[in-house]
């Protein structure tokens, strides 16, 4: 488990956007396992699951549908999909077939983590993963992130709230 700490405006989210391919950098190189992300874009996207700060989920799809769509975007063969396992790990099984618009904020956060996991990346990057949630839910989310580590996934969290995030 790794953390990148810094005040608001320090560029933490920009780094995530560069890694995710939604922003370009001006100079320098970023390598993942020795591969330059600019020249090996597909491999780097497969290596990283990104959990954005914003609760970007489609309100008119169920969590299960969203995971299946995400798996399809990453060309995960149907036989290799583990959406039910991921829903269970993120404690979303009971809401798997409910419209996402009916999920609480904490459930939406967990759904974003699940979507980042669906293509089985070895690295998951969490951008302010507990923003806007209460202390009890924050603890539950961190427990889920620890589960990811036990599953062998390297987790990198970006935050400016160090004192509250452990």
Where do the language-model regions lie?
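Conserved catalytic motifs of ABC-family nucleotide-binding domains
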Residues: 120
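Catalytic Walker B motif of ABC-type/P-loop ATPase nucleotide-binding domains
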Residues: 124-127
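Conserved ABC ATPase "signature" region
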Residues: 68, 72-95
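Helix-to-loop junction immediately C-terminal to a conserved catalytic motif
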Residues: 20
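Conserved ABC ATPase signature
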Residues: 99-103
């Amino acid at each position: 488990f790794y953390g990148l700490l810094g005040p608001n405006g320090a560029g933490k989210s920009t780094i995530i956007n560069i890694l995710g391919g939604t922003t370009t950098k001006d100079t320098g190189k970023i390598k993942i396992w020795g591969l330059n992300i600019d020249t090996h874009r597909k491999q780097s996207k497969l290596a990283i699951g990104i959990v954005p700060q914003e609760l970007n989920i489609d309100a008119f799809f169920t969590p299960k549908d969203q995971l299946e769509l995400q798996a399809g975007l990453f060309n995960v063969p149907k036989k290799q999909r583990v959406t039910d396992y991921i829903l269970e790990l993120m404690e979303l099984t009971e809401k798997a077939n409910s419209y996402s618009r009916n999920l609480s904020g904490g459930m939406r956060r967990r759904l974003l983590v699940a979507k980042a996991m669906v293509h089985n990346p070895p690295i998951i990057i969490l951008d302010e993963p507990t923003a806007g949630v209460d202390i009890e839910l924050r603890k539950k989310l961190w427990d889920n992130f620890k589960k990811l580590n036990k599953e062998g996934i390297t987790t990198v969290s970006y935050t400016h709230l160090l004192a509250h995030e452990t």
